[in-house]
Regions:
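Positively charged n-region of N-terminal signal peptides that target proteins for export
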Residues: 1-4
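Hydrophobic h-region of N-terminal signal peptides that target proteins for export
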Residues: 9-17
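Outer membrane beta-barrel
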Residues: 50-73, 77-199, 226-232
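Membrane-embedded beta-strand positions of outer-membrane beta-barrel proteins
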Residues: 63-65, 104, 141, 179, ...
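Sequence/structural signature of outer-membrane beta-barrel proteins
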Residues: 68-76, 107-115, 144-150, 160-163, ...
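Solvent-exposed loop/turn segments connecting transmembrane beta-strands
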Residues: 77-82, 110-119, 169-174, 213-217, ...
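Detector for outer-membrane/organellar transmembrane beta-barrel domains
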Residues: 218, 223-337
């Protein structure tokens, strides 16, 4: 019995001694930490948010892909079916500072051959930089989308199933400069000057008659208004301008887009018009065989969208288009609808 009591006493004494050693080590470690804190240099003063540069503001990269399975049946021809990659675009954009911004967008399924006038590939949609002069004025320069107006024109190509003939035949990514004035958050006015085309005159029109010569300043001048009215109930994308296509030949374009914007229902109506002294859109019946003058184009596009739930969008779109000039039988009427 005495041996058992002696063993228990020795065990308790050993535990107490070990606890004391551990406590001494903890106290010594705390003292060393306090000493390091006392001798460490004071942190540098930095104003609130100073030096904070979120990467998502400087650099954003996107890959956009749109594909389809197309089943087509032309009159008096067999039905065809195919998978088709409509869009494959790589985009980088961001704000370098609060004032300086940039954007680059390139199509990966289009030719990289350089154009003969602006020396850039048509696959490059956008390559521009901008500078915010203040909270109302902005300057932008580089290759950009022309600011014609219209909601179909303004939509992301990823959300387009089929363009109208008017937009399908336009070249609207041009090298140039733009000044923007936004008096408030509901209105924006743009004045833009760009090249009239990507390629030289002869590459588009070929050998022309001696009475037609290339413009000395082949430029496009566009004025555009983007507006939100009645607490964003009505939206506008209106634009118009002049294209100096050749010496003495000017083309006038007008594109008016108006949209009714309700919480679950939206509908827009676009009217697009081109009076071309020298045919540039080139989709009258004779445009592919002769040099057409005084061509007139009109396009009407109506699109309605409904979202019964946030994850579902139901749409229907209709269009009516005309193209003509004074040549005999040189008139086209087109109609279409999508849903």
């Amino acid at each position: 019995m005495k041996k058992i009591l002696l063993a228990v006493s020795l065990l308790i004494g050993g535990i107490a001694s070990a606890q004391q050693d551990l406590q001494n080590q903890i106290n010594q470690l705390r003292a060393e930490i306090d000493q390091l804190k006392a001798t460490a240099p004071a942190p540098l003063f930095m104003p609130e948010n100073e030096g904070e540069q979120p990467i998502h503001k400087k650099f954003n990269m996107y890959f956009n892909f749109q594909g389809s399975f197309d089943v087509e049946k032309a009159k008096d021809q067999d039905m065809t079916a195919k998978f088709y990659a409509r869009q494959l675009r790589w985009e980088v954009r961001g704000d370098i500072t609060d004032r300086i911004f940039y954007r680059f967008r390139h199509r990966l399924n289009k030719s990289n051959a350089r154009a003969s006038l602006d020396n850039l590939a048509k696959a490059t949609d956008m390559l521009y930089a901008g500078f915010r002069l203040d909270d109302k004025w902005t300057l932008t320069a580089g290759k950009m989308c022309q600011a014609w107006g219209g909601f179909e024109f303004d939509l992301n190509p990823m959300n387009i199933y089929e363009y109208s003939d008017f937009l399908e035949n336009m070249d609207n990514f041009m090298l140039g400069a733009m000044i923007t004035y936004a008096p408030n958050e509901n209105h924006e006015f743009n004045f833009q000057i760009t090249d009239v085309r990507n390629d030289k005159f002869a590459d588009i029109y070929g050998t022309t008659s001696p009475t037609i010569s290339e413009s000395k300043a082949p430029l496009t001048y566009i004025f555009n208004w983007n507006g939100n009215l009645f607490d964003n109930l009505i939206q506008t994308r209106w634009g118009g301008g002049l294209q100096s296509e050749a010496d003495g030949y000017n083309n006038w374009l007008l594109m008016l887009g108006t949209k009714l914007n309700l919480p679950k229902f939206q509908v827009f109506f676009d009217y697009m018009m081109a009076n071309e002294q020298l045919d540039r859109l080139k989709y009258t019946p004779m445009s592919s065989t002769v040099l057409v003058k005084d061509a007139k184009y009109n396009s009407f596009v109506l699109k309605a969208e409904y979202q019964p739930i946030p994850q579902l969008n139901i749409f229907a779109q209709g269009l009516y288009e005309t193209a003509k000039n004074d040549l005999t039988d040189n008139k086209m009427i087109g109609m279409g609808y999508f849903a």
